[in-house]
Amino acid sequence: MRLALLVLATIGYAVADLFTSIADMQNLLETERNIPKILDKYIHDEEERLVQLKKLSEEYSKKNEISIENGLKDITNPINAFLLIKRKIFDWKEIESKMNANKAGNVVSSITDDSYGVRYPTADDLSGAAIGLLRLQDTYRLDTKDLADGKIYADQGNYTFSAKDCFEIARAAYNEHDFYHTVMWMEEAQRRLGDEVEPTVEVEDILEYLAFALYKQNNLKHALKLTEELYKMNPTHPRAKGNVKWYEDLLEQEGVRRSDMRKNLPPIQNRRPDSVLGNTERTMYEALCRNEVPVSQKDISRLYCYYKRDRPFLVYAPIKVEIKRFNPLAVLFKDVISDDEVAAIQELAKPKLARATVHDSVTGKLVTATYRISKSAWLKEWEGDVVETVNKRIGYMTNLEMETAEELQIANYGIGGHYDPHFDHAKKEESKSFESLGTGNRIATVLFYMSQPSHGGGTVFTEAKSTILPTKNDALFWYNLYKQGDGNPDTRHAACPVLVGIKWVSNKWIHEKGNEFRRPCGLKSSDYERFVGDLGYGPEPRNAPNVSPNLAKDVWETL
């Protein structure tokens, strides 16, 4: 998915959450094929209408020639006067009718009609897409000019941004009181405007927004300079003159003499807000998303892969396990969902996709949040054989009870789609979070990767300082609670924004009830699993004998 996001300029009337899901964007892309046919028909109808109007014009020209020749005789004759009035009433109605017979409204309705099964973007979708782009820029440290040129790392896209596109991104930031990005993108809009033969945006608009953003970023002299440029360009501008005086007064309050207000302009300062720079978790989260946090060789040397064969069925169909981290344990179950199963689950989920929600820590109710941008759907076991099969397989993978687990949740991430650092389990003070379920806290999480983005979209643990990049057909698993039942703070994790590509995941949250003997309580918080299903005794599976992977594959396909 490249930087074609500003195609979202079409304004519709739907709920503004199209940008939260690439699946909806794919549907929108499909409708582009219908537009040329609709426009061609509209052009044909308009050409016919214009031919009729031209004919009426020629008829009136002939009548006018006669009227000019006869002069006042026409209107002094009562019959002619009557006919003149009649023509003005009835003939003009015909002309007016043909002029108003423009079918543009019908064309727009047909393009945006819900009967196509596609919701068209709104102005809020455009804003959401722009904010998503800014999130990507920050997380992956992308250069503004490179992004505007359609370049992401070494990937050169098919589209570049105009000055207007950059202006709209900057304005979206401005509306969020994000003056850091406003400055960056207004400056880029200004640079691009200078290269445009046909300007796509008014320079006055850029100067006014940029001046105010520079002021908010502590660049008063630069704000004054740009506002004076605006005033010289348009002395009748409704705010320019007043803003010049306002900036002069502010500089005077800072002790700057009026004679020095336009001298010795310092370099422009444009720092990210202190609320971000001072947030150590945010800094760690972004570094982990860039996969820049090194793992010690000592820790790596302890990791290993093995075949999980601790259930009778698994003797014949062992599951490949890759340990990614100890304490808290996190593993990847390899190749545990097939492409066909992924496709089937996606088809079941697509009609049900809705803006993803989170549990309100006070009320326990589900609400949308800006820190979780994606769409999700819940699939019950009876909705498809594939759901029942996957649920049964999760039981073999984890050795945990599925009867009290939540339904299978499917998520699709949109432009800059992400989920900020959070816990899957409820903390002690969040006693109402899962009260309605009556199954206790979330003991563990299984996360299936159903696609593999080209860049971004990793799962990161901000306290454990580890990054797991998505690998299609694999499933990430970890325990959320200590064995004695308390929440493990080291399981705080996040979904990194998707930079390039599509991210589909499905997850299963497994609860405490029914797992009293499958995962017995430990005596202290330091008790933790060495491997999946570790009951505290027996050897590690590190040296377990391997089996033929083909045998496992054949057996699983019969399940």
Curated annotation (Swiss-Prot):
InterPro entries: Oxoglu/Fe-dep_dioxygenase_dom (IPR005123), P4HA-like (IPR045054), Pro_4_hyd_alph (IPR006620), Pro_4_hyd_alph_FE2OG_OXY (IPR044862), Pro_4_hyd_alph_N (IPR013547), TPR-like_helical_dom_sf (IPR011990)
This enzyme's EC code(s): 1.14.11.2
Compartment list: Endoplasmic reticulum lumen
Domain Fe2OG dioxygenase: 404-512
Domain of life of the source: Eukaryota
Main location: endoplasmic reticulum
UniProt KW 4Fe-4S keyword: no
Entry function: Catalyzes the post-translational formation of 4-hydroxyproline in -Xaa-Pro-Gly- sequences in collagens and other proteins.
Family recorded in the similarity comment: Belongs to the P4HA family.
Name of the protein in its database record: Prolyl 4-hydroxylase subunit alpha-1
